[in-house]
Design a protein with these regions (language model features):
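Bacterial N-terminal signal peptides that target proteins for export
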Residues: 2-11
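Initiator methionine at the very start of the polypeptide chain
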Residues: 1-2, 27
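Beta-sheet-rich non-transmembrane sensory/scaffold domains
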Residues: 27-637
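Bacterial N-terminal signal peptides
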Residues: 10-21
């Protein structure tokens, strides 16, 4: 195991904090939080100092061009409701979410007896009540009077009868929230569109939006440029769209007293971002949003629990000397109830949102790599360095002056490869390496690691005959899914005192058709049994081809006490050479295929098709299908 470098960095970070700050994270005074700016004048003065410093450096090197290139690359690459409401939403959910009660923006949602699908710049509804399977309504996802040019409409969430479509506009330079109303019969009505200032939120793995009760929660980065004529033109703001709307109509939603910082010196030469969490209440007649922002380094991974957003920041990749000397990383805890954020200095970077777990034991657990890159754009698909598990008490978060102690990092084995998958299942953290967005290579031997995150036990190496492209819970146990370069394997793992493989199902000449977490779904029907659904394609297809190609089928398996058996697959029959008149979002960045379970009915969404299967004994057979493509169906608007 090559762990020493990681531990050295963690020790150096902790020692530096002790030298410069009285106390340590283990002794953090309760109630200490990050410091907010006192006024807009204080922020303006900071921008002036940054601009003067960068101009000084410009005389020593080509710093101005370097900053502008870095900022451009950064922009391109880079309060819970009552438990009853959360439980009701979870029961109606058809989405494979990380946290129960925290819905995630996706391409298909359920509203009673109606499925709502977001695809290629349009919203569609399909009725599934009783034995129905019938298209009902369609609407442009960008709403009336809004140009779709340069916009991507990626995610959707539903609260009550309100549908929120989340997009990003390069033309208008910000996140868009399109609000629609849906009737009990599935009819759609456009309501209004709002804009939030932000840089592109896209991540190949993470989702920009969450829904907790009626609260719509966003994480968005804002990369700062001290040379802008009006620095406040880059700060969080919000406006309602109308024809002829101007930039002057943006209303600030994060005053200076809601913008926070640590004692860590920030250098615009290396990049600075406002890591912004915005909460909007969809239950109110008119949308109002409030933001909290933390000023920090540009690299980021974020994770949403039931009550907080965690944002892990890392220095820009140009600052390798600084990274070698110290951590260059921090993790911020931003409460959703509007309370002041807290922070902790840390080392390394998580892989993606699944690297985090806020446990019921009041601890935060995070899998990190010493040379991680965050999860902006495709950064999560390629990271490097040693592995460690960070485990800290939530009480150790304070004003950001303290570091996580070196003993809070547990060095872990380092598998070979860059496309890391990780997941917390029961009392274990599991991780391994697969093909990611690349074509899977021929694999005869691989492994997945499992470690109890709450104690000092060693990591268990579990041998596999395939790579690790997906790790998913099967109740208290897990299934590891991956390719050997030709075939697709589903390996069930019992997470007992000593984790062990229980069974393996192999689908010949196949690969998974979706890499995102929402592509998989497990529907339990008891503690030890349930149904697995996953889109598949022919063996050897690279994961990146999911952007423009539908899955060939959705495969369904039965789990019975970790024995996996095939029930059948529902196949796709796409229309040949059909032109759907796409005007926006004409690449499936979030995929296009999902397994769907509604009550006792089983569906496969594949592009513009929904296919229903019926289980008879141990066989799943197709009973009906429908196309909701705008080419073949005339839908009422």
């Amino acid at each position: 195991m090559r762990n020493n470098n990681f531990v050295r960095v963690a020790v150096a970070t902790a020692v530096a904090a002790i030298i410069f700050v009285t106390g340590s994270a283990a002794q953090a005074a309760p109630g200490k939080t990050l410091q907010a700016f006192a006024s807009e004048r204080e922020i303006s003065d900071l921008f002036k100092r940054w601009a003067e410093e960068t101009r000084r450096r410009e005389g020593e090197s080509r710093s101005m061009q370097g900053f502008q290139d870095s900022a451009a690359m950064g922009a391109l690459s880079s309060a819970a409701q009552p438990a009853a409401k959360a439980a009701e939403a979870a029961a109606d959910s058809i989405t494979n979410v990380q946290h129960a009660g925290v819905d995630e923006g996706g391409i298909v949602k359920r509203h009673g007896d109606t499925l709502v699908i977001l695809r290629r710049g349009r919203l569609f509804t399909v009725k599934v009540g009783g034995d129905e399977l019938a298209p009902v309504s369609v609407a442009d996802a960008f709403g009336s009077g809004v140009s779709p040019h340069g916009a991507w409409y990626d995610e959707m969430l539903i609260s009550g009868s309100t549908i929120a479509v989340i997009g990003y506009s390069y033309e208008r330079g910000g996140t868009e929230i399109g609000l629609f109303e849906i009737s009990d019969s599935g009819r759609l009505r456009y309501r209004e569109t709002y804009h939030l200032r932000s840089n592109d939120y896209y991540s190949s793995r993470n989702y920009a939006s969450r829904l907790i009760g009626s609260k719509l929660v966003f994480y968005t980065p804002l990369y700062l440029n001290p040379f802008a004529g009006d620095p406040w033109g880059s700060f969080p703001a919000f406006r309602r769209w109308r024809p002829g709307v101007t930039a002057a109509e943006f209303k600030p939603i994060a005053p200076a007293t809601r913008i926070y910082r640590t004692d860590e010196p920030l250098d615009p030469w290396q990049g600075v971002a406002l890591h912004t969490v915005t909460v909007c209440d969809l239950a109110k007649p008119q949308l109002n949003c409030e933001s909290t922002a933390v000023m920090g380094a540009p690299g980021r991974v974020f994770y949403v629990s039931g009550g907080s957003v965690y944002v892990w920041t890392t220095q820009g990749r140009r600052n390798r000397a600084a990274l070698a000397a110290a951590s260059g990383s921090a993790v911020f805890r931003i409460p959703l109830d509007g309370a002041a954020p807290t922070a902790l200095k840390v080392a390394g970077s998580p892989i993606d949102q699944f690297s985090f777990l806020e446990g019921a034991d009041n601890h935060l657990n995070v899998l990190v790599r010493s040379d991680g890159r965050g999860d902006g754009m495709w950064a999560a698909e390629r990271n490097a360095g040693d592995f460690a598990l960070l485990r800290v008490s939530l009480d150790s978060f304070s004003d950001g002056k303290d570091s996580a102690p070196a003993e809070s990092y547990k060095a872990l084995p380092r598998p070979s490869g860059h496309a890391v998958q990780n997941r917390y299942v029961g009392s274990y953290l599991m991780y391994g390496v697969g093909a990611g967005w690349n074509r899977a290579q021929r694999t005869l031997y691989s492994q997945v690691y499992a470690v109890r995150y709450a104690d000092d036990s060693k990591a268990h190496e579990i041998p596999l005959a395939h790579g690790v492209d997906r790790i998913e819970p099967l109740g208290a146990n897990a299934v590891v899914i991956g390719s050997d370069g030709r075939d697709l394997h589903f390996t069930s793992v019992r997470l007992a005192a000593t984790p062990s493989v229980q069974d393996r199902y192999t689908r010949l000449n196949a690969a998974q058709g979706e890499t995102r977490s929402h592509g998989f779904y497990y529907k339990p029907d008891s503690d030890n049994a349930g149904f697995v659904g996953l889109p598949i394609v022919g063996g050897g297809r690279a994961g990146s081809r999911q952007l423009r190609e539908n899955s060939a089928a959705v495969l369904f398996l039965r789990n019975q006490s970790l024995r996996l058996t095939e029930l059948g697959a529902l196949d796709s029959r796409p229309e040949a050479n059909a032109n759907d008149g796409c005007r926006a979002s004409c690449v499936d960045w979030y995929g296009n295929s999902r397994p769907i379970f509604v009550n006792n009915r089983v569906f496969a969404l594949m592009g513009y098709e929904i296919v229903e299967g019926r289980l008879s004994g141990n066989q799943l057979a197709e009973v009906q299908r429908v196309s909701f493509s705008p080419v073949t169906v005339s839908l009422a608007r």
